Amino acid sequence: MPRSASQPPDDALQGNLFGAPEPAAPSATATASEPETASHDLSDDELGADAAARPRTRQATASEGSSEAPAANDSEPSRDEPAWGHHSQLDPLQLTPMLRHYVELKAAHPERVLLYRLGDFFECFFEDAIELSRVLELTLTGKEGGKAIGRVPMAGIPHHAAERYCAELIKQGYSVALCDQLETTPTKGALLKRDITRVLTPGTVLEEGMLSARRNNWLAAVVVEPAQGKQPLRWGLASADVSTGEVQVMQREDSSALHQQLAQQEASELLWAAALDTERPAWCPERLRLTPMASTPFSPVEAERTLQQHYGLSSLDGLGLPEHPLALQALGGLLGYLQDTQPLEEDSRIPLEVPAIVHRGDALVLDAQTRRNLELTATQRDNQLQGSLLWAIDRTLTAMGGRCLRRWLEAPLMDRQAIQQRQDLVSSLVGERSLRLAIRQLLRPMGDLERLAGRAGAGHAGARDLVAIADGLERLPQLTARLKSAISTGPEWLQQLLSPDPALAELARTIRHKLVEAPPLSLSEGDLIHDGVDPLLDGLRNQLDDQDAWLSHQEQQERQRCGISTLKLQHHRTFGYFLAVSKAKATAVPEHWIRRQTLANEERFITPDLKEREGRIFQLRARACQREYELFCQLREQVGAMAAPIRQAARAVAALDALTGLGDVAASGGYCAPTITDGRGLQLEDSRHPVVEQRLVETAFTPNDVQLGEGTDLVVLTGPNASGKSCYLRQIGLIQLMAQIGSWVPARSATVGIADRIFTRVGAVDDLAAGQSTFMVEMAETANILHHASDRSLVLLDEIGRGTATFDGLSIAWAVSEHLAGDLGSRTVFATHYHELNNLAAERDNVANFQVLVEETGEDLVFLHQVQAGGASRSYGIEAARLAGVPKPVVQRARQVLDQLTA
């Protein structure tokens, strides 16, 4: 929410989002006599009688060994049970001043969990407290709400652990509004000034602990234009990763295309103009988090105004957005949402890039089914990274490189020149092992410059973040020197590394000059800025050195006065400065000393002179810390202003990291550089599955050839169960995809024609929630393929029609095969147990039969996993059943029945 210019920035009281407070302004009354954790800034009315030392651990249940017996009557509330469960049930005028303020803020954020800073805790009340205690397993306690109200529900989290707890809330889909203290000392008789400083939602977080390092965190917004009659649905989609600054927009037709795009992107949060109680539309994937918004930010006029204000433009014509009005409206709604959830000051606005317009045909299309079947980024069985294609080929060393490779896999290229540029760089890196190793050595310790720059631009970066930025920028000239020795030209992004921006090197020098090498996590306790940077800070430090000298002299002087050689002048964070002597010497101290504390073996004293000097030291230290904080904020603002060029360099580093990793995989895996063509041919010699071959330990992978698209559009693949047909299908799809991201591929040689889409139908299960049987799921997937495949598509089918009667299934499989080979002309591999489909090859010249070989030795069956021309005549299903452990009598009876049926 907006704040006046006089209010401090979000972290004026915090080193980072949840860090230590800003140095307090020096005060003549400041002393160290108050405990560090005391809530001395809170009035009794604010704290209530129950605030002191309440428990923070989860209450034990009977199964956890609780020694307390359960209540005799569960319906009878205990004395401490809150009387009110929702703030709307109360008259605000009857609440205490603090709770009245809480309710006012909650009314502005009814859909979010409100965390309200009270001393060392963030507290929740009413319904939020009940929900927080349930979700985070915290103790639900109560607080006096007013004389006429009694106790209200309360739960809280320590402020130093707030990031961890908020991360868990965000992970579970909640949004959080943070109300922080905006001053350290209240006006007499008034509450501390507090206000909402941040709103955390799944799509807007910037904190490292709330983000997945190796995947983008997309915030998306959609505008849908209702279909008129039989006209297709028109929609515009805007997506932004606020942590990296990337912005994309697109405008399309057809609700299935919208569903496919949303499923592929997997945004953390989707915004749309709708009422809170609106049902989830059919085009929205079930697992996607929907955030309804008012329609105003999405209106054409308001959206255009928001974009002009954000990008500082008088016209949007230069962005190309007027030609995509629905996408423009979606982006306007997205930026409006960010304005409501992020700081609005010019020096702390999240730096977002100019939107990139994604056109139809820019990338190979992968629907959710294909992504799942090919196991691109997660396994089909348990949704884990290990065992996926990304796991097999990701050898990136930086988080931004990992995100880059993932984006490439999710949107393979269709432009042959762009593919060839990537592949040429991979080839250079494969051939130059020393270059590859040198680059990887430079990349290994590099921080996430993309997100670090974003945090700096938003005003949330800490001192260690800036040091990490400097370290990364200092490595750019070293990368340049290495690259120029082997690579002289390349794509536009590579020029960022071959000719780095000199302003970035200057920025790195500035950071190194001003910040110490290993700054503390807190921004409030000093030790951030080098000596010699600021005359005022140097003067304050010199005065503090003088005070240290006085303390040392005072210690020696008091020893001589008392004759106690073991006397020590020490400091404690809670009690301040004191003179410590042993118990035995306590009677020898002067009478003007004042006893401060008694310990088992030691007595501690203060003197008027020491106390007066302590106040002076604390004032100097507070002024020095305040000055360091001001200097740091100036430096952070300077770094944030350079967020755009830092991110440009970071993207170049990320691409280099991804390509170097692909080069490493290619060199160690015996891959080849595929020949990329504009034709339809797919010729692979001795191709292998990139994941399966890495997981084989005791046996070698059996390579196979592929011939598609040049005379043969449809391959009918037959063979026994468990012989490797599905693996062969997936292998073809993965190699097609790898070639189109610019990678080398696992084969002896490869010629790959660019595909516009990859379709897979491999296995099916019941969708009980949607009321669909296995057969209906299979037919729906098949229908999708037949409606959208073209002659440039690659179609991989593993069985069609097996969920119904034999002749029905065969008829469907035959008709589908004819349509794919004839009307559509798609490059297709169809694995089937319907051996009758082998007859298609005699009817159509563009159909070929292949089989997976098997060898019989007596009753044993040996799978050779080798694909060879010709059709199989048997499926060996009974033999496969025997190998799977089906009881022998059942196997014998199955053979008898088979003999009878085939007689």
From Swiss-Prot:
Q: Which GO terms describe its molecular function?
A: ATP binding; ATP-dependent DNA damage sensor activity; damaged DNA binding; mismatched DNA binding
Matching Pfam families: MutS_I, MutS_II, MutS_III, MutS_IV, MutS_V
Do the record's keywords include DNA-binding?
A: yes
Gene Ontology cellular component annotations, sorted alphabetically: cytosol
Q: Which GO terms describe its biological process?
A: mismatch repair
Q: InterPro entries recorded for this chain?
A: DNA_mismatch_repair_MutS (IPR005748), DNA_mismatch_repair_MutS-lik_N (IPR007695), DNA_mismatch_repair_MutS/MSH (IPR017261), DNA_mismatch_repair_MutS_C (IPR000432), DNA_mismatch_repair_MutS_clamp (IPR007861), DNA_mismatch_repair_MutS_core (IPR007696), DNA_mismatch_repair_MutS_N (IPR016151), DNA_mismatch_repair_MutS_sf (IPR036187)
Protein keywords: ATP-binding, DNA damage, DNA repair, DNA-binding, Nucleotide-binding
Q: Which Gene3D superfamilies match?
A: 1.10.1420.10, DNA repair protein MutS, domain I (3.40.1170.10), MutS, connector domain (3.30.420.110), P-loop containing nucleotide triphosphate hydrolases (3.40.50.300)
**Keyword Transferase tagged:** no
The entry's ATP-binding residues are: G719, P720, N721, A722, S723, G724, K725, S726
Low complexity compositional bias: what residue ranges?
Answer: 20-36, 49-62
Which SMART domains did the record assign? Answer: MUTSac, MUTSd
Family annotation (NCBIfam families) = mutS1, PRK05399.1
Q: Tell me the function of this protein.
A: This protein is involved in the repair of mismatches in DNA. It is possible that it carries out the mismatch recognition step. This protein has a weak ATPase activity.
Per the record, the similarity remark reads: Belongs to the DNA mismatch repair MutS family.
Q: Can you name this protein?
A: DNA mismatch repair protein MutS
Q: Which organism is it from?
A: Synechococcus sp. (strain CC9605)
Q: What is the lineage of its organism?
A: Bacteria, Bacillati, Cyanobacteriota, Cyanophyceae, Synechococcales
Gene it is expressed from: mutS
